[in-house]
């Protein structure tokens, strides 16, 4: 299972289905996240949380044993294509942001479902790890 920024942010902020998402992470076998996605997680949460809360998030990620996967050339090519095909401004209903494309690319490369929140990825060819 690949983990998108939206799932982490939803859990941390206590959004709808946060408990279900957290349970999926606890029960997951070898969850993964792109290293590029981790940058996005930190950027998004740094604007919303105090430093001590950010450290709590880091501990949670460690507890969930999410493997950070280096962002490589293959992922870069897939993410670039995804942005052209599904990105904001493309006219496609997915309207993925750049960070979404990093998660999309890793899910494609690894042929694994993506844990996300929202209605953007549902308009792509990625399989979902969770349906609320």
Specify the residue positions occupied by each region the protein language model found.
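Short, well-structured N-terminal submotif of metal-dependent ribonuclease cores
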Residues: 1-33, 46-59, 130
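A generic structural signal for short hydrophobic patches within well-formed alpha-helices
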Residues: 8-9, 38, 121-122
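Glycine/charged-rich beta-loop-alpha catalytic/anionic-binding loops adjacent to active sites
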Residues: 20-23, 59-62, 84-90
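Short loop->beta-strand "edge-of-pocket" segments that line small-molecule binding or catalytic clefts
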Residues: 29-32, 64-69
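Active-site neighborhoods of divalent-metal-dependent phosphate/nucleic-acid chemistry enzymes
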Residues: 67-113
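Acidic, PIN/NYN-like endoribonuclease modules and their adjacent C-terminal/linker elements
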Residues: 104-132
């Amino acid at each position: 299972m690949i983990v998108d920024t939206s799932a982490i942010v939803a859990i941390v902020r206590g959004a709808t289905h946060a408990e279900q998402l957290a349970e999926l992470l606890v029960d997951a076998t070898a969850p993964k996240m792109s290293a590029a996605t981790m940058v996005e997680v930190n950027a998004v949460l740094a604007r919303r949380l105090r430093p001590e809360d950010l450290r709590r998030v880091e501990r949670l990620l460690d507890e969930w044993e999410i493997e950070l996967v280096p962002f490589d050339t293959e992922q870069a090519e897939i993410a670039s294509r995804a942005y052209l095909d599904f990105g904001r401004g493309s006219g496609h209903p997915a309207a993925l942001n750049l960070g979404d494309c990093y998660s999309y690319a890793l899910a494609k490369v690894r042929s694994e479902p993506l844990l996300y929140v929202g209605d953007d990825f549902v308009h792509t060819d990625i399989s979902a790890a969770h349906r609320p």
